[in-house]
């Protein structure tokens, strides 16, 4: 469960290291985002010569949460931290060309097949 002011790690090579959620998209009073939801983030820590810089406001998709995701068979997949992948503000496609760490099968929609194909492991 990601809400405003939540700090997330970045699971791609866009140049951002950590970001902060500033808005959960999809409804005027929506409070929480789960895996697969799009959020608005600001870059808090970035590496030199990256594609994004500190202070940039971008869209991101949540790929891992400590809360986890419940499957129809009753199992729950949880992670050690919260992570997201930075998206292009217009096309909503990933800015980075590599994804680090596992992602869940819940991202397997038309919009995020690129993330699934780049990920080293799909749980």
Swiss-Prot record:
Keywords: Ribonucleoprotein, Ribosomal protein, RNA-binding, rRNA-binding. The lineage of its organism: Bacteria, Pseudomonadati, Pseudomonadota, Gammaproteobacteria, Pasteurellales. This is Large ribosomal subunit protein uL14. CDD domains: Ribosomal_uL14. HAMAP family: Ribosomal_uL14. PANTHER family: 50S/60S RIBOSOMAL PROTEIN L14/L23, LARGE RIBOSOMAL SUBUNIT PROTEIN UL14M. Binds to 23S rRNA. Forms part of two intersubunit bridges in the 70S ribosome. Belongs to the universal ribosomal protein uL14 family.
């Amino acid at each position: 469960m990601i809400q405003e002011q939540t700090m997330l790690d970045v699971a791609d090579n866009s140049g951002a290291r950590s970001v902060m959620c500033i808005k959960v998209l999809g409804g005027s009073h929506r409070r929480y985002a789960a895996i697969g939801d799009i959020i608005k983030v600001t870059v808090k820590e970035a590496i030199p010569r990256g594609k994004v810089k500190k202070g940039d406001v971008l869209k991101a998709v949540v790929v891992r949460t400590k809360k986890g995701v419940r499957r129809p068979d009753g199992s729950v997949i949880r992670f050690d931290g919260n992570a997201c992948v930075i998206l292009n503000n217009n096309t909503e496609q990933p800015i980075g060309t590599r994804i680090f760490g596992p992602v869940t099968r819940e991202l397997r929609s038309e919009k995020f097949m690129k993330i699934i194909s780049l990920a080293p492991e799909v749980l």
